[in-house]
Amino acid sequence: MNVLSCSINTLIKEGLYEISGVEVGQHFYWQIGGFQVHAQVLITSWVVIAILLGSAVIAIRNPQTIPTDGQNFFEFVLEFIRDVSQTQIGEEYGPWVPFIGTLFLFIFVSNWSGALLPWKIIQLPQGELAAPTNDINTTVALALLTSVAYFYAGLSKKGLGYFSKYIQPTPILLPINILEDFTKPLSLSFRLFGNILADELVVVVLVSLVPLVVPIPVMFLGLFTSGIQALIFATLAAAYIGESMEGHH
């Protein structure tokens, strides 16, 4: 019994030691001129972009009148993105399909890459590679891009009259309406970042404590959650664009 107890205590201590070694926020930088560039995000983002560009080349290469399985898949993805855009934006959704589609596909592939690609085997001088959306810099950039898009959508349709929405239905709500536009990118970025980071940390902790087979259901749940987060981000982005063009809250 003493031997068994000692073995269990040793395993627990080793597991807790490994968990304590899990680091968040360690970064690897490139020095370019007088600037420090966050290399981890760039490397993983380039990989995701390469996957998307490669898929696009495959999708448009040699299209068939009778679609093949691969062509059917890409057409299904395109129709899905169109449906999301049309539902949220309305009749003028057409010009925004590429933007919403790019957001959705980049976030979706980025999220899944954290679970499916073996980033950890690539050794860096400092830090480690992870999904691009595992970094707050990426999610904030995507959220700010969305903010620019819905401001552009409103201004391009209504001109300076777009800003009249801030005093509707009453000028008393001006501070609240302004604050709402600041909270939109914050909620988009932190929701995506928090969910992806938490998912990866949960898997790391479980793998440290229990055999590899046990965390597999959690990993599948993480894949499902990652897809949902991409859909939520793209849907909200389309909704904000539609809202700015319609001029109501």
Curated annotation (Swiss-Prot):
**Any stretches that span the bilayer, and where are they?**
40-60, 97-117, 136-156, 201-221, 222-242
Q: Is-annotated flag, keyword Plastid?
A: yes
A Gene Ontology cellular-component term: chloroplast thylakoid membrane
What is the protein's major site of localization? plastid
Pfam families annotated for this entry?
ATP-synt_A
What membrane topology was assigned to this protein in its record? Multi-pass membrane protein
From which domain of life does this come? Eukaryota
Signal peptide position in this chain? Answer: none
Q: What does this protein do?
A: Key component of the proton channel; it plays a direct role in the translocation of protons across the membrane.
Quaternary form? Answer: F-type ATPases have 2 components, CF(1) - the catalytic core - and CF(0) - the membrane proton channel. CF(1) has five subunits: alpha(3), beta(3), gamma(1), delta(1), epsilon(1). CF(0) has four main subunits: a, b, b' and c.
NCBIfam families linked: ATP_synt_6_or_A
Query: What family, per the record?
Result: Belongs to the ATPase A chain family.
Q: What's the protein name? A: ATP synthase subunit a, chloroplastic
Organism (species): Barbarea verna (Land cress)
Gene that encodes the chain? atpI
